[in-house]
Every structure is written in structure tokens, then in C-alpha cells.
Curated annotation (Swiss-Prot):
Lineage, broadest ranks: Eukaryota, Metazoa, Chordata, Craniata, Vertebrata
Description of post-translational modifications: Phosphorylated in mitosis.
Provenance organism: Xenopus laevis (African clawed frog)
Primary localization: cytoplasm
Example GO biological process: establishment of chromosome localization
A Pfam short name: NUDE_C
Protein name per Swiss-Prot or TrEMBL: Nuclear distribution protein nudE-like 1-B
Gene Ontology CC terms, in alphabetical order: centrosome; cytoplasm; kinesin complex; kinetochore; microtubule; spindle
Region (Disordered): 186-209, 325-344
Coiled-coil parts of chain: 13-190
Compartments, as annotated in UniProt: Cytoplasm, Cytoskeleton; Cytoplasm, Cytoskeleton, Microtubule organizing center, Centrosome; Cytoplasm, Cytoskeleton, Spindle
Gene: ndel1-b
Length: 344
């Protein structure tokens, strides 16, 4: 009410009315506050008496509680002593159990490690067993293939012996023909001296072709050996010599050319047989590891047939590519007595 603002009055009557109403309100609030004060004093006296009785009762209960508290403290002390004794015993038991647990765990770890080692060793043994079985089966298969190839090689070696005899026979025939040609040339020397010194152009060409054919080597691979057919000394054209007739020269050229082709084919076939024999012997000397590394090439070669046509087959690739295994077949078999060695 103190904070109420006094309004502005237009007339004194309004101001008088305002202050009268305000006095009535203040008087009424004063009466109400006085009644409340009287009522509060009466209630406070009653409350004070009640609180005094409650205080007396609380003091009595406090004395009882203090006695109970003292008794409970004694019981707590006795229980604490018992608890400490029990705790010490339980601590000793727990320590013993922990030590036993540590020992049991260490034994368990050792057993687990031992079991793992046994399992690993068992797995290694099983893998080694499987690998041994596979390698044994592979070795048996390759052994069977080697036996078959050896049988085939033996047949080829027999055929090679027959080819050597044929080649030697053809060489003897070629040597006889060469000697015959030399005799004929010597016989015609006297005729050539008396004949005109200007032969025809055709005779010169035929003579040069005969000399070129006679000077060809016996091997088709281009190697000149001690057993190759060498032509006699070149006959000079003209200068008082008379050449053979064209028909005789052509026939001799054809005969010698056929013989050279046959000998070349036989020597090529013989070279293929020798290379095949060397390759087979080198394959026998390989270890099982080398057999495993070359399994694909050997298996692929099982379907390739050996050719008798004078060219190298699959089994000759080692020698053709420059690979000649050392120690294979020891040394070449000696030629039969009375036969000339064949150069390859």
C-alpha cells in the first residue's frame, strides 16, 4: 500500500472520498491482523506445552538408545574380532587355491601346446604321406612309360644296326662307282689328248655339274667328314683333253645323285636314332625331382609318334637344340669290323 501511487484529483471531494476508503481498508486489515496475533499466541502456548512433553519423552528414549548403543558397540567389537580371524583364515585358503590354480593353468597350457605340436606333426606326417603316395604313383607311371620307351628304343636300335649295314653297303657301292669313274677318266686321258681342245658349251656345263655332284659331302647336314664322298681332281676343260659323252655324264650324275640322297636320308635317320637314344638315357638318369619338373613335357610327348622319314622328332629336340647330356651311353658303340665309321 505504501507503494501505491496517489492519483491526481480533479476536485477536493474526490480526494476526501479516496482517503476515507483508504482509512477503512487499513482499519479492517488492522483488526484482522490483531485477531490472527491473538490466535497465534494461543496456538504457540499449546504447542510449547506439547513440545515440552515430547522433549521429556525424547530424552528418555535417548537414554535408552545410548544404553543400546553401548551394548551394540560391544557386540560389534566381538564380531569384528571374529571377522578378522575368519578373514585371515579365508585369505590363507584363497592364497593356496590361487597357487594351485596357477599351477593347474600352467599344466593346462603345456598340455595344449603339446596337443598342438602333436596335431601339427600329425598334419605334417599326413601331408608327407600324401606327397609320398602321389610321387610314388607318378614315379610308377613314369617308370612304366620309361619301360615302354626303352622297348621302343631297343627296336629302334635294332633298326639302326640294319641301317648301318645298309649305309655301309651304299658307301661301298658309291666308292666302287667313284673308282670306276676314275678308271674311266684315266682311260679317256689318252683320247682327250688326241681330241680337239675346244669342247662344246654343253659338254663343259655337263662336266662342271658332274664335278659339283661328285664333290658333295655324304652327310646332308653340311658337315665334311673323313668318309664323305670327295670328287676327284677337276678335269681341265680344253687344253687337248676330251670329256665324256653327254649321255654318260648325265647317267653318272643321276646315279651319284640318287646314291647321295639315299645316303643322306639314311644318315639323317641314324642321327635321329642316336639323338633319341641319348635323350632316353638322359631321362633315365634324372632324379625324381627332375622327373616332377618335366612331367608336363613327358606327358605331352606320349602322343607324338616317332618319324622314320629322316627328320628329328620330339625325342630329338635335346640334341638338335645343342643339348647333349654327358655320360649318356658312355661312348658310341664301335663300328663292326670291316665297316667305315659314319659321321653324323
Amino acid at each position: 500500500m505504501e507503494n501505491e501511487e496517489i492519483p491526481e484529483f480533479l476536485s477536493p471531494k474526490e480526494e476526501i472520498v479516496y482517503w476515507r476508503e483508504l482509512a477503512k481498508r487499513l482499519k479492517q486489515s488492522y483488526q484482522e491482523a490483531r485477531d490472527e496475533l491473538i490466535e497465534f499466541q494461543e496456538g504457540s502456548r499449546e504447542l510449547e506445552a506439547e513440545l515440552e512433553t515430547q522433549l521429556i519423552q525424547a530424552e528418555q528414549r535417548n537414554r535408552d538408545l545410548l544404553g543400546d548403543n553401548q551394548r551394540l558397540k560391544c557386540e560389534v567389537d566381538s564380531l569384528k574380532e571374529k571377522l578378522e580371524h575368519q578373514y585371515a583364515q579365508s585369505y590363507k585358503q584363497v592364497s593356496l587355491l590361487e597357487d594351485e590354480l596357477v599351477r593347474a593353468r600352467s599344466i593346462k597350457d603345456q598340455l595344449h601346446k603339446y596337443v598342438r605340436e602333436l596335431e601339427q606333426a600329425n598334419d605334417d606326417l599326413e601331408r608327407a604321406k600324401r606327397a609320398t603316395i602321389v610321387s610314388l604313383e607318378d614315379f610308377e607311371q613314369r617308370l612304366n612309360q620309361a619301360i615302354e620307351r626303352n622297348a621302343f628304343l631297343e627296336s629302334e636300335l635294332d633298326e639302326k644296326e640294319s641301317l648301318l649295314v645298309s649305309v655301309q653297303r651304299l658307301k661301298d657301292e658309291a666308292r666302287d662307282l667313284r673308282q670306276e669313274l676314275a678308271v674311266r677318266e684315266r682311260q679317256t686321258d689318252g683320247i682327250r689328248k688326241s681330241a680337239p681342245s675346244s669342247p662344246t658349251l654343253d659338254c663343259e656345263k655337263t662336266d662342271s655339274s658332274v664335278q659339283a655332284s661328285l664333290s658333295l659331302p655324304a652327310t646332308p647336314v653340311g658337315k665334311i667328314s673323313e668318309n664323305s664322298f670327295t670328287s676327284p681332281k677337276g678335269i681341265p676343260n680344253g687344253f687337248g683333253t676330251t670329256p665324256l659323252t653327254p649321255s654318260a655324264r648325265i647317267s653318272a650324275l643321276n646315279i651319284v645323285g640318287d646314291l647321295l640322297r639315299k645316303v643322306g636320308a639314311l644318315e639323317s635317320k641314324l642321327a635321329a636314332c642316336r639323338n633319341f637314344a641319348k635323350d632316353q638315357a638322359s631321362r633315365k638318369s634324372y632324379t625324381p625331382a627332375n622327373l616332377n619338373s618335366s612331367s608336363s613335357s613327358v606327358l605331352n610327348s606320349s602322343g607324338v609318334k616317332y618319324s622314320h622319314a629322316g627328320h628329328t622328332s620330339f625325342f630329338d629336340k635335346g640334341a638338335v637344340n645343342g643339348y647333349d647330356p654327358p655320360g649318356v651311353l658312355g661312348s658310341r658303340p664301335p663300328s663292326p669290323p670291316g665297316l667305315l665309321p659314319l659321321s653324323v
